[in-house]
Amino acid sequence: MSTDAKNAIAQMEKIVSLCKRRGFIFQSSEIYGGCGGVWDYGPLGAELKRNLRNVWWNTMTREREDVLGLDASILMNPAIWKASGHVDTFADLMRECSLTNKRVRADHVEPQDGVVMNYSGAKSPTGWKLARPISVLMKKGEHIESLRKRVRTLIASNAGEAAGKVEEIELLDEAKGDTLERTIDFHPETGGALGDARPFNLMLKTYLGPTATEADVTYLRPETAQAIFAQFKNVYDSSRMKVPFGIGQIGKAFRNEVTPKNFTFRSREFEQMELEFFIKPDEAVEIISGKVDTWSEGADLSEPKPNWGWQMWHRYWVDQRTKFYEGIGLGDVLEYYWQTPEDLAHYARACVDILCEFPFGTEELEGIAARGDFDLSAHQTASTKSQEIFDEELKTAAAKLTAEQKDALRARKQEEGRNTVKKKAEKERREPTADDFAAMEKSMNYFCDRLFAGNYVPHVIEPSAGLDRMALAVIAKAFSETEKVDEKGKKEIITVLRLHPRVAPIKVGVFPLLKNKPELVAKAREVYALLKKHMNCFYDETASIGRRYARQDEAGTPFGVTIDFETCGEKGPELADTVTLRHRDSGEQERVKITDLLGKLLPLVS
Ligand code: ATP
């Protein structure tokens, strides 16, 4: 293992241990040995998550005039997941271990070296038999006896009680096979030969209602976005918004991830924060504004304009989301991956992944996709309920087009349609058929007819972020260690969590200098009562003041307020009712009047 990899593991271990020690994140069901890929947020974690949620909600909905919120259910009619494509295609390619049936993601098998050992089967004195051949990789450096023991143990745990005692299982007709280098055909943990790659759907199934037949199957939502599409018309009709506008939602999502890993980064239950921002198709913008503004380097993205096409809107949201991350202290650890045409889904026009530096590598934090009208159109077809909106301005502008202008637009759409058919067929590795072209021609003509009458299915830009990944990203970014010499001259490593004040779970620690001085305690409780109505504070009177600062540094608290004898007026009237305000990151300490505290702190933490 490389030094970098070892350091990354060590860093993650420290972060996981801090999260448990200070009550940020616990393993779910820990007293029962845990529950794979599921995590619980402790008192500090719950506050941190709530702050992140609030920053997202405020920035994305409340502070904007063009985005509304939604809070939809986790369980929905399974027809939604059929229409969205999740039932048929939301799958990872998996390979199964022939020894244990344990699955592994096909693209997660690291190459291994070793010798193949073959057995015709196994039996035990209980009469139990395994009547099929098995092949296992004896890894380079592994002793044959330890391989046999491993195989017996795996067989026994798969067979259950019937196989009897592990040590009494007999492996039959052992034969040495090929020596392999960099093989990816054996399970990385068990060493058992892997079967062919097969798709494995990531949706978690459940049954709705008292009977548990196939007709009652539904799914825990694997993303929050589909509810936004399914409720698009209700929100549109009830809010009197005009396109362009967006609908944002925060909520739980579930994916039966095959290999949940890297702490909360890849979980089976997690929270998403998604925005579907609905825009006019470029053709509608062109008819209304005469020309569509497309993106070029240096384009002004500060304020949306009526002539923006999808490209500008996509770039705008990448810019907005970048500003969001800057506002929570992640600005300098972001990278962008623009998906190539080969990466893109056939309906997507562009997609950028916002990546973040984690100890285990630079990984996706958020995806921002321009998805055309794929989602609303899919629901329109499947539900047979129109998802079109009527745009008076478009109708008026279209009425002024000449017949030639309309024909030219139609011809352009037909050409685009033919190219889409070819591209889709190419992705599916087949020849496009005459029927494909005929269907596309019909659909393009329909689109133009409806457009000229002022109707269209809105297109969408989708910034989709994960709350748990964001929480982990801010913790990982904030984690730092410094060496300190304590009061007795002993060196110790102090952990300081340099969380941005906006997301820090506790904003201010309030400390009376001494706990046995009633006047200090009374004043400190007064300050605590004043602040806690406006922000999450922590009152602490135990241990030395240095220890108390250190405890709050480790919890990520950005400010500390100490109430001392000066506060009580013992060193003259000019310092009476002032406190020491300590800034975690700069170490600066300043004297502030109690009456000025709130005004000073509020802008820093919100
Ligand atoms: P990945 O490629 O990492 O599996 P994805 O591209 O499938 O992610 P999306 O479907 O685009 O992810 O989901 C949007 C966001 O939801 C992701 O950027 C991520 O922040 C979050 N997310 C997705 N899957 C998980 C998961 N298993 N655990 C935690 N967060 C997740």
Where are these predicted regions, by residue range?
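NTP/phosphate- and nucleic-acid-binding module
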Residues: 1-606
